[in-house]
């Protein structure tokens, strides 16, 4: 980072009344002679690990859905990756991490990654090249809206998915990420903490997922199956979950932006939290019948999502209790939403990601220690109960923003191109209706051969 940019940045932050820690980021960058090779290597490896989480998410979700919708979820996620990558490179990074505009959003100074150096650091990451940080954060920006696909699976048109993903990323994710990670109002003025995305990613996506599930309504035969449609390929789902688990170490420990004690602590917290949450799910599922595969993998994902915001701020021993709380809360949230309220969040995104992200973010207010991460704060257990209120402010602000805008975007998209497929198309499956393909060629059309022909003849890609 050149001297002029450093001076300009420090002056702007002082003028805006930023905390000394925010100003210090610029000074740390100025004092850094060159990016550290070891830290740069770790962040680049973490970037690759988080990228791998996205096809892993596709495997996980495809295996849990019905076979006639396998390719649709894979196509949504893989298409989302490339669209969101282009957006981030063109303007997303700049809106998120560009110079702050009244605490709300960045500007377009770094559009198309202009002046994002491959040689010098950035204030957000004083030990690595600015470009390495930009590409690492690209993966977070990419995966966030893709998490929502599990909530509305098997019901939403592909073009509606693309429209919602693009609009949601711009209106929800970029501002929220700026508020907490990019020098915006929640961190600058209140000190809201989110190590790797419990608020920015899991709360925003989880709350939005619930809104979408409510908006699009239940799938056909929801009551018949009690909300638990038979999965098509549990081994595929398990492989996806295992790859997600592995990638989560890059997600959480990579957020330390250095290969050191904070990254090590995040690795420990991630493994412990995910494991204890899974144990809770195994015990509860066994108590109701038999321990099943879906419970194991959902329990792991719930724990990993919930430990995400706290992993770099708390002693890893707290991950035991937090993991247990996350397992209990997510399990009974699924029972409440799906089996009591009959909300068809197909893959329980609101419970496994949303609720756990909220709990983990609030846990920072109790368990955070400056001795673990000097860039954080002490929580209530260490003499600072105000941090609980700070974290609550962050969670509520992001949840309300995400929920409100998601509903508005759905209404606009529905009024223009439509959101949901009709019931007869749902019967055939999105693989055929939206993409003209089958994942498995032994799928029965179940007496719908005539409708199959009409669907084929109605789509341009068969002409």
Curated annotation (Swiss-Prot):
Positions of transmembrane segments: 40-60, 77-97, 128-148, 161-181, 195-215, 234-254, 266-286, 294-314, 317-337, 352-372, 393-413
Protein name listed in UniProt: Ammonium transporter 1
Side of membrane Extracellular, spans: 1-39, 98-127, 182-194, 255-265, 315-316, 373-392
Disulfide bonds: none
SUPFAM superfamilies: Ammonium transporter (SSF111352)
Organism in which the protein naturally occurs: Dictyostelium discoideum (Social amoeba)
Any one Gene Ontology cellular component term annotated for this protein: phagocytic vesicle membrane
GO molecular function terms attached to this record: ammonium channel activity
Keyword field contains ATP-binding: no
Record topological domains on the Cytoplasmic side: 61-76, 149-160, 216-233, 287-293, 338-351, 414-463
Membrane topology classification: Multi-pass membrane protein
Keyword line: Ammonia transport, Cell membrane, Cytoplasmic vesicle, Endosome, Lysosome, Membrane, Transmembrane, Transmembrane helix, Transport
């Amino acid at each position: 980072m050149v001297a002029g940019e450093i001076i300009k940045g420090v002056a702007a932050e002082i003028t805006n009344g930023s905390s000394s820690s925010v100003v210090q980021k610029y000074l740390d960058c100025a004092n850094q002679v060159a990016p550290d090779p070891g830290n740069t290597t770790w962040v680049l490896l973490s970037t690759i690990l988080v990228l791998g989480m996205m096809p892993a998410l596709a495997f996980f979700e495809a295996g849990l859905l019905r076979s006639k919708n396998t390719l649709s979820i894979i196509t949504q996620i893989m298409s989302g990756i490339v669209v969101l990558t282009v957006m981030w490179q063109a303007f997303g990074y700049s809106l998120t991490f560009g110079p702050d505009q009244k605490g709300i959003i960045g500007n377009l100074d770094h559009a198309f990654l202009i002046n994002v150096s491959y040689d010098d650091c950035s204030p957000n990451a004083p030990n690595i090249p600015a470009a390495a940080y930009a590409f690492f954060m690209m993966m977070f920006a990419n995966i966030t809206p893709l998490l929502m696909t599990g909530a509305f699976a098997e019901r939403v048109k592909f073009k509606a998915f693309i429209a919602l993903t693009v609009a949601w990323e711009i209106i929800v994710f970029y501002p929220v990420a700026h508020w907490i990670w990019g020098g915006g109002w929640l961190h600058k003025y209140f000190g809201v903490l989110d190590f790797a995305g419990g608020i920015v990613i899991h709360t925003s996506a989880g709350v939005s997922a619930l809104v979408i599930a409510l908006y699009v309504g239940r799938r056909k035969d929801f009551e018949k199956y009690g909300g638990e449609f038979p999965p098509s390929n549990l081994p595929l789902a398990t492989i996806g979950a295992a790859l997600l688990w592995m990638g989560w170490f890059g997600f959480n420990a990579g957020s330390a932006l250095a290969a050191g004690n904070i990254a090590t602590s995040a690795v420990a917290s991630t493994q412990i939290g995910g494991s204890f949450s899974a144990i809770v799910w195994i015990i509860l599922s066994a108590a109701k019948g038999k321990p099943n595969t879906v419970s194991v993998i959902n329990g792991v994902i719930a724990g990993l999502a919930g430990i995400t915001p706290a992993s770099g701020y708390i002693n890893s021993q707290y991950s035991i209790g937090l993991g247990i709380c996350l397992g209990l809360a997510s399990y009974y949230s699924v029972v409440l939403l799906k089996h009591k309220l009959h909300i068809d969040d197909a893959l329980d995104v609101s419970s496994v990601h949303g609720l756990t992200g909220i709990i983990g973010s609030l846990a920072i207010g109790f368990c955070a220690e400056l001795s673990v991460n000097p860039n954080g704060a002490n929580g209530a257990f260490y003499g600072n109960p105000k941090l609980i209120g700070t974290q609550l402010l962050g969670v509520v602000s992001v949840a309300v923003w995400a929920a409100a805008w998601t509903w508005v975007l759905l209404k606009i998209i529905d009024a223009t191109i439509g959101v949901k497929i009709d019931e007869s198309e749902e019967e055939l499956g999105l693989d055929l209706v939206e993409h003209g393909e089958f994942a498995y060629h032994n799928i029965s059309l179940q007496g719908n051969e005539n409708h199959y022909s009409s669907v084929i003849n109605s789509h341009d890609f068969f002409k």
